[in-house]
C-alpha cells in the first residue's frame, strides 16, 4: 500500500497530483507568476523551490532530472539559464505566496505565487552583522558604565560629608527646574 502524500490533497490519484504539480511548476517558470488556489500554491512552493535548486546546480544530471518531471524543454531551458542565474546569490526562498481573496463562484481562497527574482540586497546581510556586533558590544559598554558610575559615587560620598549644605541647595535648584519643565510639557499636549 503506497504511503499517502503529506499535506492537502489536490484531488484525483497520486499520478494526477504529480502531473498537476508539474504543470503548475511549468506555468510558474514560464510566466514568473500564476494565480491559483491557496492549497495548490502551498503544495507548489516546495516543489518549485526544489526544481530551482536543481537548476542552480546546472549539471547534466540535474537537467535530466528536471526534464523527467517537466516535459517542456523550453521551460526547462528558461529555468536553467534565466531563473537560475537570477537567483544564484539567493539561498532558498525563491517563491512568494500572496493571498488575494476569494474566487467568485465557489468562494475558494485564491493566491498569487511568484518567483522572487530581485537580487538579494547586501544591506540586509550588513544589518544582520551590525545587530550581532551591537549585541556583543552592549554588555561590554554596560560594564564600562557600571565602573564609571561607581567611581563618581565614591567621590560623591566624600563630597557630601564635607559639603552637605551645598548639596541641599543643588537639590532645591533641581526641583525648581523640574517644576518649570512640567507646565511646558503639559502645554505641548
Swiss-Prot record:
Positions of region (Disordered): 136-189
Keywords on record: Ribonucleoprotein, Ribosomal protein
Keyword Lipoprotein included in the entry's annotation: no
GO cellular component: cytosolic large ribosomal subunit
Lineage top rank: taxon: Bacteria
Family according to the record: Belongs to the bacterial ribosomal protein bL17 family.
Subunit comment: Part of the 50S ribosomal subunit. Contacts protein L32.
HAMAP family with a match to the protein in the record: Ribosomal_bL17
UniProt name for this protein: Large ribosomal subunit protein bL17
Species: Paenarthrobacter aurescens (strain TC1)
Gene: rplQ
